[in-house]
């Protein structure tokens, strides 16, 4: 039964392909995201830029706040739990959240083990910097992968690095002889059947989105160019001058990433972009959490 549920969850996540998932902190923001064409929203009390600025321990959001967002929109609602925090995940499943993001943006609850996602009915999203991380999360039951990037910075460089790393490792795995895949699986520290799937199909067994530092329509188009199947936008929208216009532009750019003339028009007069943090200035590297 768990296997059937896992396959169903993977197929559910496929329906989000080509879309944009936006971080929102209020029902009003959720409505702006829905009106802009977001395929889902991520409900959280503080966007990554504020979590980074505040420091301290960041935890799952208040269920009452999440319910307010669920009631405000008809699109799927996601919410984050700390890495390894089984109880937080059970709470979110109990309030009928659509997807759970086991997220490095929050303070990890367990520095060794991730949640056994196969024991849940609700689909999980997890971050990854490379192919090994991605396939380990899939083995644990993740229905969707996203690059970790570096959340709350407005700097897309790490998302680019993670996507390119994953693509390179996939190409390397595809190029191997069949009998070499066993050793590759061992080196990646992943189950053989998942390594074999990538070898045979040239892609992950689940949807792969881009996340971390996407702040402009051009950033979204770049990640699609590099093979992302959709985009998460966190701080980039509601930390900008004109959130509604920027949100709609990023949705359009993600769907039409090959149309440079349209991208040029979408990039005009968007108001002030979020103030970013350069990679060299980052004090806390969130992407290093939960490998």
From Swiss-Prot:
**One Pfam family, short name please?**
SOR_SNZ
Q: Which UniProt keywords apply?
A: Lyase, Pyridoxal phosphate, Schiff base
Q: In which pathway does it act?
A: Cofactor biosynthesis; pyridoxal 5'-phosphate biosynthesis
Q: What reaction gets catalysed by this protein? A: aldehydo-D-ribose 5-phosphate + D-glyceraldehyde 3-phosphate + L-glutamine = pyridoxal 5'-phosphate + L-glutamate + phosphate + 3 H2O + H(+)
Binding, D-ribose 5-phosphate: 23, 152, 213, 234-235
Q: Name one GO molecular function term.
A: pyridoxal 5'-phosphate synthase (glutamine hydrolysing) activity
Q: Where is the active site?
A: 80
As recorded in UniProt, its EC number(s) are 4.3.3.6
Output the GO biological process annotations, alphabetical, semicolon-separated. amino acid metabolic process; pyridoxal phosphate biosynthetic process; pyridoxine biosynthetic process
Enzyme class, spelled out: lyase
Locate the residues binding D-glyceraldehyde 3-phosphate: 164
Among InterPro entries, the record links this protein to: Aldolase_TIM, PdxS/SNZ, PdxS/SNZ_N, RibuloseP-bd_barrel
Q: What does this protein do?
A: Catalyzes the formation of pyridoxal 5'-phosphate from ribose 5-phosphate (RBP), glyceraldehyde 3-phosphate (G3P) and ammonia. The ammonia is provided by the PdxT subunit. Can also use ribulose 5-phosphate and dihydroxyacetone phosphate as substrates, resulting from enzyme-catalyzed isomerization of RBP and G3P, respectively.
Q: What family is reported?
A: Belongs to the PdxS/SNZ family.
Quaternary structure, from the entry = In the presence of PdxT, forms a dodecamer of heterodimers.
Query: What NCBIfam families does this protein map onto?
Result: PRK04180.1, pyridoxal 5'-phosphate synthase lyase subunit PdxS
Instruction: Report what the protein is called.
Output: Pyridoxal 5'-phosphate synthase subunit PdxS
Which species expresses this protein natively?
Answer: Bifidobacterium adolescentis (strain ATCC 15703 / DSM 20083 / NCTC 11814 / E194a)
**Which gene does this sequence derive from?**
pdxS
């Amino acid at each position: 039964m768990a296997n059937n549920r896992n396959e169903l969850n993977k197929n559910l996540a496929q329906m989000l392909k080509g879309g944009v998932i936006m971080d929102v902190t209020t029902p009003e923001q959720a409505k702006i995201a829905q009106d802009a064409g977001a395929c889902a929203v991520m409900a959280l009390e503080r966007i990554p830029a504020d979590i980074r600025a505040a420091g301290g321990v960041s935890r799952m959001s208040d269920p009452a706040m999440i319910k307010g967002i669920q009631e405000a929109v008809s699109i799927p609602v996601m919410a984050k739990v700390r890495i390894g925090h089984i109880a937080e995940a059970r709470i979110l499943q109990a309030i009928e959240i659509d997807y759970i993001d086991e997220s490095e943006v929050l303070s990890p609850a367990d520095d060794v083990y991730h949640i056994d996602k196969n024991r849940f009915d609700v689909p999980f999203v997890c971050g990854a910097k490379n192919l090994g991380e991605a396939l380990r999360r899939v083995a644990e039951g993740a229905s969707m992968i996203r690059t970790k990037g570096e959340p709350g910075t407005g700097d897309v460089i790490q998302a680019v690095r993670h996507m390119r790393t994953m693509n390179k490792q996939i190409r390397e795995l595809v190029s191997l002889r069949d009998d070499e895949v066993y050793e590759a699986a061992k080196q990646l520290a992943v189950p053989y059947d998942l390594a074999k799937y990538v070898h045979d199909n040239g892609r992950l067994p689940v949807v792969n989105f881009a996340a971390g530092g996407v702040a402009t329509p051009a950033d979204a188009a770049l990640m699609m160019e590099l093979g992302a199947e959709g985009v998460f936008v966190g701080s980039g929208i509601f930390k900008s001058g004109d959130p509604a216009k920027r949100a709609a532009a990023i949705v359009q750019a993600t769907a039409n990433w090959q149309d440079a003339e349209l991208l040029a028009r979408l990039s005009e007069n968007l108001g002030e972009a979020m103030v970013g943090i350069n990679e060299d200035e980052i004090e806390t590297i969130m992407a290093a959490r939960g490998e």
